[in-house]
Regions:
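Extreme N-terminal starter segment of soluble prokaryotic enzymes
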Residues: 2-7
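Glycine-rich phosphate-binding loop of actin/hexokinase-like ATP-binding domains
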Residues: 151-253
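Adenine-nucleotide phosphate-binding core of ATP-dependent small-molecule kinases
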Residues: 264, 271-275, 282-317
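Internal helix-turn-beta structural module
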Residues: 297, 301-321, 331-398
């Protein structure tokens, strides 16, 4: 087992999430979350050995300041000299990258080239990457793309039915997301079931505030619900998912809304929040629906119905169904949603085992269908940080 540790960074436009992992055991030795970056009240919270403490970043409230504070914290715990490499989550690698890669100047230029595909995320990833390069001098950096797993999708799945010059000129196509999670979960599902992943036709539902679903066959992505951006597909916490594109023209004409306003509404004010008028949090929606709140009940019903429909279509893309896999915060913990979704899927030969479904929560993996089901439904907790750490160690030669 390597004695060197892996630092994993995930930078947002105003946040930085980090973790120091032992790549061998998967143990997290230190984690941090910086928020309100680029604002006067920026801060970072560190967690070590179960203890949390907060550090003010107001003197240097940007991504570099956050990484500097992280370096000081590592020194305080004697961990700085044990870091062997740094892994970075990057949202979009477009069509340029079908796998994780060691960072050099050419890779940085490639990430810059993909900024139009992820205008909020890729610039932030670059800030974190440059900060890591300057503060952790001489250490290898590896980038792991959310999109790379989906580069195996066939043309019929990733192309939009629009004039093809838009694809050729602007890269207008479906890229998908959550790829690092899908890669980890596909491997874990095969291991858990004692099968070779190349022999499993899987439909994997990554359900969190952002939610998507992917068909996996021969260990590869065959289709996925998110598209050019993460707005396409399932009903999500605040995103609408699939919607008639002419909504833009309709609202511009009738509600006097701009493209930017409509885009923000569909991304940040729709989904469970928009339908219920209450919350984007699935736990709150479930609780209020149980109390009889009409908006919450409708939000839950729509979330489940859309998900069940997509599972059917992804079974087509996978060429059949051997395993339906639930992961992500909602997928791993909501026995209610899993049971109701499987209730739609009797035609695929799936029948819920209620006792097993209740047990498979709070980090517990498990098969949740009956022994006589034609396929299995299984809950597999995801671990994107560990997948990034594995890639980083491998590509850095650790």
């Amino acid at each position: 087992m390597s004695q060197k540790l892996i630092l994993v960074l995930n930078c947002g436009s105003s946040s930085l999430k980090g973790a120091v992992l032992d790549n061998g055991s998967g143990e997290v030795l230190l984690s941090c979350l910086a928020e309100k970056l680029n604002l006067p009240d920026a801060y970072i919270i560190f967690k070590v050995n179960g203890e949390k403490h907060k550090v003010d970043l107001s003197a240097h409230p940007d991504h570099t300041g956050a990484v500097e504070a992280l370096m000081e914290e590592l020194k305080a715990h004697g961990l700085d000299s044990r870091i062997g490499a740094i892994g970075h989550r990057v949202v979009s690698g477009g069509e340029l990258y079908s796998e994780s890669i060691l960072v050099d100047d050419e890779v940085i230029a490639g990430i810059e080239k993909c900024i139009p595909l992820a205008p909020l995320h890729n610039p932030a990833h670059l800030l974190g990457l440059r900060a890591a390069q300057s503060i952790f001098k001489g250490l290898p950096n590896v980038v792991v793309f959310d999109t790379s797993f989906h580069q195996t999708m066939p043309e019929v799945a990733y192309k939009y039915a629009v004039p093809q010059e838009l694809y050729e000129k602007y890269g207008l196509r479906r890229y998908g997301a959550h790829g690092t999670s899908y890669r980890f979960v596909a491997d874990e599902t095969a291991r858990f079931l004692g099968k070779d992943k190349k022999d499993l036709r899987m439909v994997i539902a990554h359900l969190g505030n952002g939610a998507s679903i992917t068909a996996v066959a021969n260990g590869e992505s065959r289709d996925t619900s998110m598209g050019l951006t993460p707005l396409e597909g399932l009903v999500m916490g605040t995103r609408s998912g699939d919607i008639d594109p002419s909504v833009f023209g309709f609202l511009a004409e009738n509600a006097n809304m701009t493209i930017a306003q409509i885009t923000e509404m569909l991304n940040k004010k729709s989904g469970l929040l928009g339908i219920s008028g209450l919350s984007n949090d699935c736990r709150t929606i479930e609780e209020e629906a149980a109390k009889g709140h009409k908006g919450a009940k409708l939000a839950l019903d729509m979330f489940i119905y859309r998900l069940a429909k997509y599972i059917g279509s992804m079974a087509v893309a996978a060429g059949g169904l051997d395993a339906l896999v639930f992961t992500g915060g909602i997928g791993e913990n909501s026995d209610i949603i899993r049971e109701r979704v499987i209730g739609y899927l009797g035609f695929l030969g799936l029948n819920i085992d209620q006792e097993a479904n209740l047990k498979a929560r709070f980090g517990n993996a498990g098969v949740i269908t009956t022994a006589d089901s034609k396929a299995v439904a299984v809950v597999i907790p995801t671990n994107e940080e560990l997948m990034i750490a594995h890639d980083t160690a491998r590509l850095s030669g650790l």
